[in-house]
C-alpha cells in the first residue's frame, strides 16, 4: 500500500553552494535591499527603498503583506550590518508630514528590531534628514551577546511536549556543540532502563506505540476514532485537498526537523485532532503520486550538518492509507514516519545575513555552523 522513501541530505558540491548563495543574494535584491556604493553617511551603507513610518500611519496601512515585508526588510538589513562591522541604512520616508521626533518609528517596527537585538539602544541610532531615515548600526559584539554572529531565525527545530519549537541561536549552539563533542548520536534512541520508572515518559512512549499501530494499518473507516493525541512523538492535522500542497510546504520542514532532532515521530495528515476522528482528504491516485513526490522533494532539500563519520541520510517512510465509507474508498490519510537523526536537520537555511562583494547575502547553513562553532570562547 505505502511506498518507502528515503530523502538524501543536501549536496555539498561547490556548484550547489554557489547556487544557494546566488539565490540568497537575489532574495535580498527582491526585498529592495541594495548596497549604497556611493554612501557618504557611513563606511558601509544599505538602501532600503521607501517605508511608511509612525504608529498612526502604519496602523492605516491596508496591505498587511507590505507591512510585514517592511518589518522583514529592516530586520534583515540590520542583521547584515551587525555581521559586517556596522554601517548605516538609508530609508526613504513613504508618508508625508512625518516627523521622527513626533511620530516615532511605529510599534511593529520597534518590536521587529527588539527581536534582532535585546539591547537596541546600544547598537542602533536613528536620525531624520531631507525625507530619509538613517539607521546607524554598530558592529555585532560577541562579548555583549555571547554569540559570534547575529541571527534572526535559526530554523533549527526540536520537539517540545506536543509542539515543534524553533530553538534560539544560543540553544542551537549548545545543541551543535553537544553533537560535535559526541561525534553525533545513535539513530536509535537508548531504551529506558527497566529498573527506573518514569510514568510520564512511559506514557509518551505508549502514545508512540499507539501511533505506530495506526501507522501500520492498511485501511481506515471514515470517522473512526483514534486513541491518542498530539505528543512529543506524534503530530496530527486535518487539511482539505485544496490546501494540502501549500500546507505541506509550510508544515513539513518544521515537523521533520523537529522529529529528526529529537527522537523521531509520526505525522498524520487527515486526522482531526479535536474530535479524534479519522477523516482523510479526497484525492485521485495521480494526486497521491504528485504529493509523494512533493514530500520527497521538500525533505531532500532540508539542510543538514554532520559531526559523525557515517553521515547518514534523513530516513523516513511515507504511505497513503485508504479511508473507507459504505464499502468504498472516500479519502486517504498521509502517514509519515520520521526517524531520529544522527546529527542536525534544519527546516531551512538559518536567517543570518552579511554584506560581501557588494551584495547582501544570507549565510549558508555550512557557513553559519562554522562561524558558530569556530568562534573563540569567552
From Swiss-Prot:
InterPro entries for this protein: Poxin-SLFN/SLFN_N, Schlafen, Schlafen_AlbA_2_dom, Schlafen_AlbA_2_dom_sf
Keywords (A to Z) from UniProt: Adaptive immunity, Cytoplasm, Immunity, RNA-binding, tRNA-binding
Main location: cytoplasm
Induction: Upon interferon-alpha (IFN-alpha) treatment.
Effect of residue 278 to N: In elektra mutation; impaired T-cell quiescence. Mice show elevated susceptibility to bacterial and viral infections and to diminished numbers of T-cells that fail to proliferate in response to infection and diverse proliferative stimuli
GO biological process: negative regulation of cell population proliferation; response to bacterium; T cell mediated immunity; T cell proliferation; T cell proliferation involved in immune response; tRNA stabilization
Domain of life from the UniProt record: Eukaryota
Any one GO molecular function term: tRNA binding
GO cellular component: cytoplasm
Pfam families with a match to the protein in the record: B3R, SLFN_AlbA_2
UniProt tissue specificity: Mainly expressed in the thymus, lymph node and spleen.
Function noted in UniProt: tRNA-binding protein involved in T-cell mediated immunity. Plays a key role during the metabolic reprograming phase of activated T-cell, when T-cells produce reactive oxygen species (ROS): acts by binding tRNAs and protecting them from cleavage by the oxidative stress-activated ribonuclease angiogenin (ANG). Also required for T-cell quiescence maintenance.
Identification of the protein by name: Schlafen family member 2
Species of origin: Mus musculus
